[in-house]
């Protein structure tokens, strides 16, 4: 498994980028500082309590709304290593990959994951393991080049390393 977390952060459908990081904070240039406001408009407990390595799980169309790399950036800055969702808004999906935050879509199976479940992820196989329920969910496998971009820490690092 690439990632394993005993605690997850569970969110519903249509969580938009304006909720992930409200526009009123976008003047803050440092992503670690900006991350202190992550999810503030939907979950005031997230930013002060999330621990590095804890996984985020969401419903349909996660990251819809404005095209801003700040949204996946603040989630990554808080130490979330991967986001699992029913589906992602396409621009959020690409922005997440471009900054080195892996995302995996598992469709309706996401409804089997409850807030208290321990979760594991094997990115290369596109599998999410529900360690609490002893179940596994086949997600969309990411093409190898996308896995390589995420592993490099994002598109910029990937391009630098290809020299």
What positions do the PLM features span?
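Alpha-helical scaffold segments in soluble metabolic enzymes
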Residues: 19, 33, 37, 95, ...
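Feature captures the catalytic cores and cofactor-binding loops of soluble hydro-lyases/lyases
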Residues: 21-125
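Acidic, glycine-rich flexible loop/linker segments
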Residues: 99-163
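Conserved phosphate/anionic-ligand binding catalytic regions in large, soluble enzymes, centered on
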Residues: 15, 63-69, 150-160
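N-terminal, positively charged, Ser/Thr/Ala/Gly-biased leader segments
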Residues: 1-23, 156-163
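Short hydrophobic "helix-edge" motifs at membrane interfaces and signal-peptide entry regions
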Residues: 3, 55, 143-145
